[in-house]
């Protein structure tokens, strides 16, 4: 049994999250078609600094992530520093933890703050599913390398003459796990079947997600944490997420066919999060540094945990594994939480995690714990909707969830919030936040 691990600096300062911002999220090939992730990252960090009125030289480190990486800009963090007017001396490096990438970025900045190497930093992530690294076949790639080494035109022609037409076809990015060949949707189907999650339950969760997200926008709750994005050719700005279904009915979801298991499946495009473009970032500081600058934090990072599970079975169970660890390290239980925000990769994955969190048997036989993490109160769960509605730019989702949860906690008078996500490769992440 782990003991509570307070996240404080050597001087006893808490880790403060003073500000957070994101772009509107856009479905693949819509508002951000042709806009690379690095530009989305520059956009959000530049605007975040402008709104916070924090002098750029105050920021000593920027940790940023991108899951679908572009070969021409492998260190997106450094490109953002150089493209936003920040000091060229700002330390910057990139991280990748699949769908939990900005969770990792936040943890890394927090660790720098606790170590005392910095007093303020930015963490976040950006991804584009509209600007993708389209590759070439292995045979063509090898031929190009060999041709570069060839000394004569004849040698080059001989190499290229061995290629067939199919070798010249472009190769799109893989959508399956490298180690298993399974797609995320295949795992979502497996989890639904194994744990008895019905199509009706999945559709109901997806419908709820869209309803609550639409309501959050209608009530103006997201206005301050989402910037207006201007992208080439600068004709129409984007000020809201464009994936949210504002007028759908539950009956509409039943009309869609399964997307992965065509005959017997229950996972559809409507009860899954779509491919999405966007960026999000947060500013973290030591509590004393925020006080020196006259800033009121949105809240504080109380604890975090990262876990890993098998990739062949129940690969998306990260939240059920990481949540009890994060709660334990925070010295809290599920009952102490005011809000719980779980990344909705698929409705089946979300419902399976909720089901197993409440299971004593799962706790004993799988986690090796004496009792269940706890049943999640629906009135506390994803109260502003989730990723099924907002979309999921892989590296940006964690920062969205953190900012959104802290702002909602403040509207409710403070308390503790949990944000948690599954990720490719069987990874999981959870963070406990505190607002006053």
Curated annotation (Swiss-Prot):
Organism: Cronobacter sakazakii (strain ATCC BAA-894) (Enterobacter sakazakii)
EC class: transferase
Covalent S-S links between cysteines: none
Listed Pfam families: Thiolase_C (PF02803), Thiolase_N (PF00108)
Function text: Catalyzes the final step of fatty acid oxidation in which acetyl-CoA is released and the CoA ester of a fatty acid two carbons shorter is formed.
Protein name: 3-ketoacyl-CoA thiolase
NCBIfam families: AcCoA-C-Actrans, FadI, PRK08963.1
Subunit structure: Heterotetramer of two alpha chains (FadJ) and two beta chains (FadI).
Any one Gene Ontology cellular component term annotated for this protein: cytosol
Keyword Nucleus: no
SUPFAM superfamilies in UniProt: Thiolase-like
Catalytic activity, EC: 2.3.1.16
Keywords, in A-Z order: Acyltransferase, Cytoplasm, Fatty acid metabolism, Lipid degradation, Lipid metabolism, Transferase
Pathway: Lipid metabolism; fatty acid beta-oxidation
Family affiliation: Belongs to the thiolase-like superfamily. Thiolase family.
Catalytic reactions of this protein: an acyl-CoA + acetyl-CoA = a 3-oxoacyl-CoA + CoA
Active site: 99 (acyl-thioester intermediate), 392 (proton acceptor), 422 (proton acceptor)
GO molecular function terms noted in the UniProt entry: acetyl-CoA C-acyltransferase activity
CDD domains the record matches: thiolase (cd00751)
Family annotation (InterPro entries): Ac-CoA_C-AcTrfase_FadI, Thiolase, Thiolase-like, Thiolase_acyl_enz_int_AS, Thiolase_AS, Thiolase_C, Thiolase_CS, Thiolase_N
Localization annotation: Cytoplasm
One biological process term in Gene Ontology: fatty acid beta-oxidation
Name of encoding gene: fadI
């Amino acid at each position: 049994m782990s003991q509570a691990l307070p996240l404080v600096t050597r001087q006893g300062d808490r880790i403060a999250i003073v500000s957070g911002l994101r772009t509107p999220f856009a479905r693949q090939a819509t508002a951000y078609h042709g806009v690379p992730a690095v530009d989305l990252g520059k956009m959000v960090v530049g605007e975040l600094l402008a709104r916070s009125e924090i002098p750029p030289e105050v920021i000593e480190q920027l940790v940023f992530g991108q899951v679908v990486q572009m070969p021409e800009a492998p260190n997106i963090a450094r490109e953002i520093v150089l493209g936003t007017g920040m000091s060229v001396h700002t330390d910057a490096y990139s991280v990748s933890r699949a769908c939990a990438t900005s969770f990792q970025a936040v943890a890394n900045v927090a660790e720098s703050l606790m170590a005392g190497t910095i007093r303020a930093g930015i963490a976040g992530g950006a991804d584009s599913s509209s600007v993708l690294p389209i590759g070439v076949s292995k045979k063509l790639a090898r031929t190009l390398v060999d041709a570069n080494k060839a000394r004569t035109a004849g040698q080059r022609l001989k190499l290229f003459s061995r290629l067939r037409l199919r070798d010249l076809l472009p190769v799109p990015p893989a959508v399956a796990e490298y180690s298993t060949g399974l797609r995320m949707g295949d795992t979502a189907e497996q989890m639904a079947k194994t744990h008895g999650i019905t199509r009706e339950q999945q559709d109901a969760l997806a419908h709820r997600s869209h309803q609550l997200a639409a309501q959050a926008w209608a009530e103006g709750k997201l206005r301050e944490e989402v910037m207006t994005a201007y992208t080439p050719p600068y004709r129409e700005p984007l000020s809201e997420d464009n994936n949210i279904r504002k007028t759908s009915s539950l009956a509409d979801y039943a009309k869609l066919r399964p997307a992965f298991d065509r005959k017997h499946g229950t996972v559809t495009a409507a009860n899954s999060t779509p491919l999405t473009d966007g960026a999000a970032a947060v500013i973290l500081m030591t509590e004393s540094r925020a006080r020196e600058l006259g800033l009121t934090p949105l809240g504080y990072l109380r604890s975090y945990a990262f876990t890993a599970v098998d990739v062949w079975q129940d690969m998306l169970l990260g939240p059920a594994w990481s949540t009890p660890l994060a709660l334990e390290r925070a010295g809290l239980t599920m009952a102490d939480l005011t809000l719980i925000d779980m990344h909705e990769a698929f409705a089946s994955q979300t419902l399976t995690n909720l089901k197993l969190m409440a299971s004593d048997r799962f706790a004993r036989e799988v986690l090796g714990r004496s009792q269940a993490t706890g049943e999640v109160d629906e009135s506390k769960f994803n109260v502003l909707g989730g990723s099924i509605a907002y979309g999921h730019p892989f590296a940006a989702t964690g920062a969205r969830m953190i900012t959104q949860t802290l702002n909602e906690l403040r509207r409710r008078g403070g308390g503790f919030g949990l944000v948690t996500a599954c990720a490719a490769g069987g990874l999981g992440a959870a963070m406990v936040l505190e607002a006053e």
